[in-house]
Swiss-Prot record:
It is found in: Plastid, Chloroplast stroma. It comes from the Eukaryota. This is CRS2-associated factor 1, chloroplastic. PROSITE patterns: CRM (PS51295).
Length: 701
């Protein structure tokens, strides 16, 4: 049997028995599913020959070169601020954006140039429907000087022109910008206009494109019913708000009366009329931005390739000075970058979360405003270098700047307070009189005193200098509080004791004016015991001057006495007014043990200073000590024990159950809020409990 030999063999070892291949009609089918028949491949239809159905080329668009004359088409000009469109009769050249156009000349165009206005003014073929025909019904134009009657139904509220000053009339035929604005607004009028528009929701929003051409008509639409247009700026345009305000005033014709942050209040003018406003054609297409030069050069000017790479490498490790939020107000960004350049030559700004185009626009603005050199935009950060030509905006520091500044501060404070001490030159002049004759010494001292009076200076204490009298009196001697400062010539130099030549005790009184109108200072009999130094001449017996000068001198002397009062400071030292508080704190620190004072001998020994420092450090507290902590005021709560406190103690002694304790804790808050008379504890009254009967039974059991 031919089939028995085939079935006795295993299918797994068929390769060991080479046999001839069976015909197709005798083969066994090992699969339970039939294979599907192969589908014939379909042929693609031939591509149409019409160019409208051809495949779109997905490559970079070809750049259109700019001709040498800078006018690639009729009415289109290439300027230093991008593309500009010129129309006959227009007051200025139109642009898509008046504030966000880069300050660089384009290199090439991305599309064929054309005028982006309506079909009436553009040579571009119209690809859509024809414009609708004009309405046969002519609607009357809105006139700001002919307002609808108030209270008319279906009419929105409209503000009249103005405000007008008293005695002035409105100008109906105002042509120029100055005539439309009229007289400058007063401060009260500005405050009233801003306050009326501050909370209004009707506003014009300016975004990343800045002030566009079509916004000019939108502003006039706001001015149709309101005197002030509220403009809110966000994003890139807020980097240079001064440029935004300038372009608004130049292109629209209004006046910026107030701006804070990113909000601008634009006033239309006193004589504004919507009927005679300038009408500009609207842009129906947004023109493609031209090709500008690269913002970031691979090798910036003034750097070598290695230096540029090293700066970019250092910039990756540099922390950013700030992080810009999306649609934020970047009003102080330029100022922050300039201040950062004072400390480091590289500055990094974090722009993560912003659009890529916004980051580059901000970098281009900073490049022109700071100015600086852009190094990279990687990782959504702006890396800037201040450049080799950078100059600090701070004034140069010199060696004597600190001394000059301190002298100026001292002089200003002395002049403001009116209390200061005598300069050293006055003392030196007084002590050097013995080397000069009487007349020359009198002239020198008189000149020095006059100069000190003019500069607002007064005589101070000089105990160690002979011939100078202290305004407060010398040690152990009391002087009159009202006596002016002068020298006593009662005794001659021959009668002076050598021990008395170092001090001078004097008192004086003022008499009436003489015939010449001069005030003469005389001395009473009680000055007979006072001694005079030979350094003081007899010609200085009187000091002549007007009564106003004497009164001013007396006032300054009293202020000096108040300055050198009992504040722990030596009276013969020159102490400025601004040092009083410091010296007082120093004295308090020594008295309280918070400061340690060493003399010259102790300070010279380093080991002694170290030992004293260690011992003084150990006396300080380890933790922070707050001496003036605010105390919590509990109102009129009394400190004596309340009734509920006694009940809680009684419950704790008897070990009350948990639910009873929880109830007492919950009700404790309400008990504390009772009146004071309910909290008072009376000894002759039995306290009433708040427990229920079953709980009392458990406790008594």
């Amino acid at each position: 049997m031919a089939t028995s030999h085939l079935t006795s063999r295993s299918l797994l070892v068929q390769a060991q028995y080479p046999i001839s291949r069976l015909p197709s009609n005798l083969r066994l089918s090992l699969s339970h599913h039939k294979q599907p028949a192969a589908v014939a491949k379909r042929r693609r239809a031939p591509a149409p020959s019409h160019p409208a159905f051809s495949s779109v080329i997905r490559g970079r668009p070809k750049k259109v070169p700019i001709p040498e004359n800078g006018e690639p088409a009729a009415g289109v000009r290439v300027t230093e601020r991008g593309l500009a469109y010129h129309l006959d009769g227009a007051p200025f050249e139109f642009q898509y954006s008046y504030t966000e156009t880069p300050r660089a000349r384009p290199v090439a165009l991305r599309e064929a140039p054309f005028l982006p206005f309506g079909p009436e003014v553009t040579p571009r073929p119209w690809t859509g429907r024809k414009p609708l025909p004009k309405s046969r019904k002519e609607l009357p134009e809105f006139d700001s000087f002919m307002l609808p009657p108030p209270g008319k139904k279906g009419v929105k509220p409209v503000q009249s022109p103005g405000p007008f000053l008293a005695g002035t009339e409105p100008r109906y035929q105002a042509a120029s910008r100055e005539e439309v604005l009229g007289e400058p607004l007063t401060k009260e009028e500005v405050d009233e206009l801003v306050k009326a528009t501050l909370k209004t929701k009707r506003q014009l929003n300016i975004g990343r494109d800045g002030l566009t051409h079509n916004m000019l008509e939108n502003i006039h639409s706001h001015w149709k019913r309101k005197r002030v247009c509220k403009i809110k700026c966000k994003g890139v345009c807020t980097v240079d708000m001064d440029n935004v305000c300038q372009q608004l005033e130049e292109k629209v014709g209004g006046k910026v009366i107030h701006h804070q942050g990113g909000v601008i209040f634009l006033f239309r003018g006193r004589n504004y009329n919507y009927r005679t406003r300038p009408i500009y054609p609207l842009m129906l297409w947004k023109p493609a931005a031209p090709v500008y030069p690269r913002l970031v050069k691979k090798i910036p000017d003034g750097l070598t390739p290695d230096e540029a790479e090293d700066m970019r490498k250092r910039g990756r490790q540099l922390p950013p000075i700030c992080k810009l939020g999306k649609n934020g107000v970047y009003l102080n960004l330029v100022k922050q970058v300039r201040e950062a350049f004072e400390a480091c030559d590289l500055v990094r700004v974090d722009c993560s979360g912003l659009n890529k185009s916004d980051c580059r626009k901000i970098g281009a603005k900073l490049k022109d405003l700071v100015p600086c050199t852009l190094l990279s935009f990687e990782f959504e950060h702006i890396l800037m270098w201040r450049g080799n030509d950078w100059k600090s905006s701070l004034p140069p520091l010199e060696e004597n700047d600190f001394k000059v500044a301190s002298d100026q501060i001292l002089n200003s404070k002395e002049a403001g307070s009116g209390s200061a001490l005598t300069p050293i030159e006055l003392v030196n002049n007084a002590t050097s009189l013995k080397k000069c004759n009487l007349i020359e010494g009198a002239e020198k001292l008189e000149d020095s005193m006059k100069s000190s009076f003019e500069n607002g200076m007064i005589l101070g204490s000089a105990c160690g200098n002979p011939g100078v009298c202290n305004s407060e009196g010398i040690d152990g001697t009391e002087s009159s509080a009202d006596a002016p400062i002068e020298f006593s010539p009662s005794n001659s130099a021959r009668d002076l004791d050598p021990s008395q030549t170092s001090t001078l005790y004097c008192q004086s009184s003022l008499l009436d004016k003489s015939e010449n109108g001069e005030l003469i200072e005389m001395y009473p009999d009680r000055c007979g015991n006072s001694e005079q130094s030979p350094d003081v001449p007899e010609a200085l017996t009187c000091l002549m001057g007007s009564s106003d000068e004497i009164h001013e001198l007396e006032t300054m002397r009293r202020n000096c006495k108040h300055l050198n009062g009992s504040d722990g400071v030596n009276s013969d030292s020159i102490v400025p007014s601004y040092m009083e508080g410091i010296l007082l704190l120093f004295k308090q620190a020594i008295d309280s043990g918070m400061a340690l004072v060493l003399n010259e001998n102790e300070f010279a020994d380093a080991n002694y200073v170290y030992q004293k420092s260690v011992a003084f450090t150990k006396t300080a507290p380890r933790y922070l000590v707050l001496r003036h902590t605010p105390r919590k005021s509990h109102g009129t709560q009394k400190t004596e024990p309340a009734k509920n406190v006694r009940i809680n103690k009684h419950l704790e002694e008897h070990k009350v159950s948990d639910h009873v304790k929880k109830k007492e804790i919950v009700m404790g808050g309400s008990r504390m809020q009772r009146n004071d008379h309910a909290r008072e504890f009376l000894s002759d009254v039995v306290p009433q409990g708040t427990l229920r009967v079953d709980e009392l039974a458990k406790l008594l059991a």
